[in-house]
Amino acid sequence: MKLTILLLVAALLVLTQARTERRRVKSRKTSSTYDDEMATFCWSYWNEFQYSYPYTYVQPCLTLGKACTTNSDCCSKYCNTKMCKINWEG
């Protein structure tokens, strides 16, 4: 009887741990994809308007619903990502 209970508890622990790990991996994938999309979005905006509106990151950030009060590099978190640098360098 005790052995059965121990086996059940062990099985539950294994299942719980596997579930947690799956959730952790899933959230990591989601944020990575989001960051890549954001980097591409910000880079495209910068590339298109760099001659007429240099350093203007306000518009894309407002489009994304981010509060942005100054003209400072609002999207620098995304524009400094690896994907954005690859795009920028060609």
Swiss-Prot record:
Q: Which GO terms describe its cellular component?
A: extracellular region
> What are this entry's molecular-function GO terms?
toxin activity
Localization per Swiss-Prot or TrEMBL: Secreted
Key words, A-Z: Amidation, Cleavage on pair of basic residues, Disulfide bond, Knottin, Neurotoxin, Secreted, Signal, Toxin
Q: What is its main location?
A: secreted
Q: Which residues form the signal peptide?
A: 1-18
Q: In which tissues is it expressed?
A: Expressed by the venom duct.
Cysteines joined through disulfide linkages: 61-75, 68-79, 74-84
Q: Which residues carry this modification: Glutamic acid 1-amide?
A: 89
The family note in this entry says: Belongs to the conotoxin O2 superfamily.
Domain remarks in the Swiss-Prot or TrEMBL record: The presence of a 'disulfide through disulfide knot' structurally defines this protein as a knottin.
Protein name as catalogued: Conotoxin Im6.2
